[in-house]
Regions:
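Short Pro-Cys-Gly-centered "Cys-loop" motif that presents a nucleophilic cysteine in a tight turn
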Residues: 1, 10-174
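Glycine/serine-rich anion-binding loops at beta->alpha junctions
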Residues: 4
């Protein structure tokens, strides 16, 4: 993507680490680009957007959403041709030592070739426009990506109500 980046990151048990990581990443990338181009501007126009993802039900869906993003934007014909994607690694076309595989990907098969084949079939299979829209909307609004049960669990853990609402202020009651 020319104007944004998608990262699927597991902050483990410390979600605040995500903000620290993004601050450092933004600062380093901005300084690098500014020194390269002889400028003194900001690089990113706004704060990063994040959406906690329910691993079992939605992590693979989110991976497919990210892998197919450059294809849907007509930047490449096939996901494996996007040089910034993990797709080519996950289907065995190339290798990257720094890439960590998530538990859902690893759980696709006991063998590496089985995982690669299953993941390729999953990504190239019929994606649900409704799920893609749900993922996109959750990301745009920085809301949870998952089932109602997942939302309930997070509400209980946080001790506050979490509701996925549309954009804007609620209408006043008459």
């Amino acid at each position: 993507m020319t104007n944004h980046v998608h990262l699927i990151i597991d902050p483990l048990d410390q979600p605040e680490n995500l903000s620290v990581l993004m601050k450092k990443l933004s600062g380093k990338q901005t300084r690098y680009t500014n020194s390269l181009e002889g400028r003194s501007d900001t690089l990113w126009e706004s704060r990063f957007k994040s959406s906690p993802v329910e691993s079992d039900a939605y992590l693979l869906q989110c991976s497919r959403y990210v892998e197919l993003n450059p294809v849907k934007a007509n930047m490449v014909k096939q996901a494996e041709n996007w040089k910034w994607s993990s797709y080519a690694v996950k289907v065995g076309i190339s290798s990257k030592e720094w890439l960590d595989f998530d538990v859902c990907y690893i759980g696709l098969s006991k063998s590496e070739s089985g995982r690669q084949s299953t993941y390729r079939q999953f990504v190239e299979g019929q994606a649900s426009d409704k799920k893609d829209e749900q993922i996109h909307d959750a990301l745009e609004r920085c809301q949870l990506t998952g089932t109602g049960k997942f939302t309930d669990e997070i509400e209980k853990r946080m001790g506050r109500r979490i509701e996925n609402r549309g954009p804007g202020r609620p209408r006043k009651g008459r």
